[in-house]
């Protein structure tokens, strides 16, 4: 099952987007609908709201007077926090009940207005945000919903900012045009990203990663940050640390080329723990690559952890690897044991390249040569670079010793 988090500011067009995804075959779990359901007459949700805000938020028939509640709940941050503290847990519980009844190969679209505000974005393998600028949203709310302009602006101001939404968005859909434009874009996202992602997950297979070098993308750090947050949630306390590694982590150097693949390292206590994370990582969108179980061993292996420093044990180069099923964001997830030489070098390599222009230039030359010789074949590209790493490993540790590097 693929779970998608769908959100957007009030008036941005979230309802149209969720309807389109439903027509494409998604099972939509609407946060607004659930929020109304959990405060129906006779529910614990409505009773809690009355306790918090008073009986004057009720209509004559005992149902919730939403305008009366809004007048109290949106007047300040404290009141809004009380409202969210009552409604959000009840909605989450009802959502979990619905999802538990869904078949394993489905695409569940969770329409959550306050996805960002509630900190739920990392729970989803994919987050889709629909956007429209503030003035357009105000106009829609006034003209289409009959809302007073002051009320519309207050509602918008009470929600997350565009910057906060961009930070969690894997897919950003602009809805400044016609409804037909949004529907077309939404269907394209479904056909080219969502559906292939869901298929890959169901088959426990990864998305094909690009093998060609491309110019540095300034958005790589932000993309990696979303993935790191997602993996921290998926791994929980079993992840000792989660780091952006590899060439895409060497940011701030526009001339430094890399494959458009984000590499992440999850540090664990043991390979047994890494194996325990196979299913949680699959649920997060990262199937395991069973055929990759170790890095290339280096002689006189180094580590800042004394018992692993200056060792020659092949076992200390073992690891587990997962990769993304999402065709829109190729990602490798390396699970390595704390203190083992391969775990240490993955962290050191990024810092060494960032601090040493000569090392970056050397590595770029090697990568470009490997790229030409591999002609788009990823395995050949990786193999072609490996001899350079034997020398680079020693050079990096010489630098680490000189600057007293610590991970």
UniProtKB/Swiss-Prot annotation:
Provide the effect of residue 14 to A: Shows a 50% increase in the Km for ATP and a 19% reduction in kcat
Q: Where in the cell is it found?
A: Cytoplasm
GO BP terms in the entry:
coenzyme A biosynthetic process
The yes or no answer to whether the keyword Phosphoprotein is present is: no
Quote one Gene Ontology molecular function term: dATP binding
- For the region UPF0157, give the residue spans: 211-407
Q: What is its EC number?
A: 2.7.1.24
Q: How is its activity regulated?
A: Inhibited by CTP. CTP strongly binds the enzyme at a site overlapping that of the leading substrate, dephosphocoenzyme A. Binding of CTP probably prevents interaction with dephosphocoenzyme A and oligomeric transformation to the active form, which limits the catalytic efficiency of the enzyme.
What additional remark is attached to this entry? Was identified as a high-confidence drug target.
Tell what the record comments on domains.
The C-terminal UPF0157 domain is involved in the proper folding of the full length enzyme.
* Chain's role: Catalyzes the phosphorylation of the 3'-hydroxyl group of dephosphocoenzyme A to form coenzyme A. Can also use dATP, with lower efficiency, but cannot use GTP, dGTP or CTP.
Q: What's the protein called, per UniProt? A: Dephospho-CoA kinase
User: Which organism's genome codes for this protein?
Assistant: Mycobacterium tuberculosis (strain ATCC 25618 / H37Rv)
Q: Which gene encodes it?
A: coaE
């Amino acid at each position: 099952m693929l779970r998608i988090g769908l959100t957007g500011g009030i008036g941005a067009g979230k309802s149209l987007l969720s309807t389109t995804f439903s027509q494409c075959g998604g099972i939509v779990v609407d946060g607004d609908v659930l929020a109304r359901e959990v405060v129906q007459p006779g529910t614990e949700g409505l009773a809690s709201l009355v306790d918090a805000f008073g009986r004057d938020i009720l209509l004559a028939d005992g149902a919730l007077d939403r305008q009366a509640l809004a007048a109290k709940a949106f007047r300040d941050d404290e009141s809004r926090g009380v409202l969210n503290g009552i409604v959000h847990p009840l909605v989450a519980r009802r959502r979990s009940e619905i999802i538990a009844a869904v078949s394993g190969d489905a695409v569940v679209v969770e329409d959550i207005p306050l996805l960002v505000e509630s900190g739920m974005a990392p729970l989803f393998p994919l987050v889709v945000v629909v956007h429209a600028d503030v003035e357009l949203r105000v106009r829609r709310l006034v003209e289409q919903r009959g809302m007073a302009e002051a009320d519309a602006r207050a509602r918008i101001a009470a929600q997350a900012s565009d910057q906060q939404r961009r930070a969690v968005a894997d897919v950003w859909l602009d809805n400044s045009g016609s409804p037909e434009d949004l529907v077309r874009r939404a269907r394209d996202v479904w056909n080219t990203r969502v559906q292939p992602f869901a298929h890959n997950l169901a088959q426990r297979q990864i998305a094909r990663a690009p093998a060609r070098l491309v110019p540095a993308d300034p958005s790589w750090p932000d993309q990696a940050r979303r993935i790191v947050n997602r993996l921290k949630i998926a791994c929980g306390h079993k992840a000792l640390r989660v780091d952006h590694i590899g060439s895409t982590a060497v940011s701030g150097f526009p001339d430094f080329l890399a494959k458009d693949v984000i590499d992440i390292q999850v540090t664990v206590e043991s390979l047994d723990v890494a194996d325990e994370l196979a299913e949680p990582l699959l649920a997060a969108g990262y199937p395991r690559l069973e055929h990759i179980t170790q890095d290339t061993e280096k002689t006189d292996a180094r580590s800042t952890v004394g018992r692993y420093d200056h060792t020659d044990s092949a076992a200390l180069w073992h690891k587990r690897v997962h990769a993304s099923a999402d065709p829109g964001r190729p990602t490798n997830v390396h699970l390595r044991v704390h203190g083992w030489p391969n775990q240490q070098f993955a962290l050191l390599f990024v810092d060494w390249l960032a601090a040493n222009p000569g090392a970056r230039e050397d590595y770029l030359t090697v990568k470009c040569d490997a790229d030409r010789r591999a002609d788009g074949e990823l395995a050949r590209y990786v193999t072609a670079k490996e001899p350079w790493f034997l020398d680079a490993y020693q050079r990096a540790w010489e630098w680490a010793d000189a600057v007293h590097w610590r991970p």
